[in-house]
Design a protein with these regions (language model features):
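Acidic, glycine-rich calcium-binding repeat modules characteristic of RTX/beta-roll
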Residues: 1-13, 22-25, 29-45, 68-84, ...
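GD-rich hexapeptide-repeat beta-solenoids
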Residues: 10-12, 21-29, 51-74, 88-124, ...
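Stable alpha-helical elements in mature extracytoplasmic
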Residues: 15, 43-49, 134
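A broad, low-specificity signal marking well-ordered, structured residues that form hydrophobic/aromatic
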Residues: 17, 80, 99-101
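Divalent metal-coordination and catalytic microenvironments
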Residues: 19, 50, 138
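Extracellular repeat-rich scaffold modules on cell surfaces
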Residues: 97, 105-163
Length: 177
């Protein structure tokens, strides 16, 4: 395959694994500076591989953690995969743009959601966000002041705070762990 081939279900991109040569932002903006918009560490497939080879790390991010979505491209900002093992956790956005917060973890299958679902502001010029690793549960989400969309799993008791705007909640029974 060529270096721009995103593979089956578009899973061959660095949004889902650092081992990919396909930069998630290159198709959207080939002139994007290399100082932001990249994956910042191991992504869903990388984390699943490490867990398979070395076992789970039950004490990693085991407290109450907050993951903040921002809407300004800055040096060092990009995409991360959340690996969190315990606690009451929150994904939050404190801005005025529309935001999509997806609480579904990666299902590590060759299908949509295999590498995770992206939580980010609804702006094609902002290259910052999160996916959630397989087996990780994020309990809560808080949106911004605009019309937000939340994706949640029916079997998880989430607390969703939409703040202002006309917000949507999409329920899924897709909890493939």
């Amino acid at each position: 395959t060529n270096s721009g081939d995103e593979g089956d279900n578009d899973l061959n991109q660095n949004m889902y694994t650092v081992m990919s040569y396909v930069d998630i932002t290159s198709g959207q903006n080939p002139m994007l500076p290399q100082s932001y918009g990249f994956c910042k560490g191991p992504m869903a497939f990388d984390i699943a591989t490490m867990q398979y080879l070395y076992g789970l790390n039950p004490s990693f991010n085991n407290g109450n953690n907050t993951y903040t979505i921002t809407d300004v491209n800055q040096t060092g900002t990009g995409f991360s995969c959340i690996y969190d093992t315990n606690g009451e956790d929150l994904i939050i956005y404190n801005g005025s743009k529309k935001v999509n917060i997806d609480l579904r973890p990666a299902n590590i299958q060759n299908n949509t959601g295999g590498g995770g679902y992206v939580s980010k502001v609804d702006d094609q010029t902002v290259y910052i966000g999160y996916t959630i690793s397989n087996g990780t549960i994020i309990e809560n989400a808080t949106g911004g002041t605009n019309d937000d969309t939340f994706h949640q799993i029916e079997s998880v008791e989430n607390i969703l705070d939409g703040n202002n705007g006309i917000d949507n909640v999409i329920y899924s029974d897709d909890f493939s762990n």
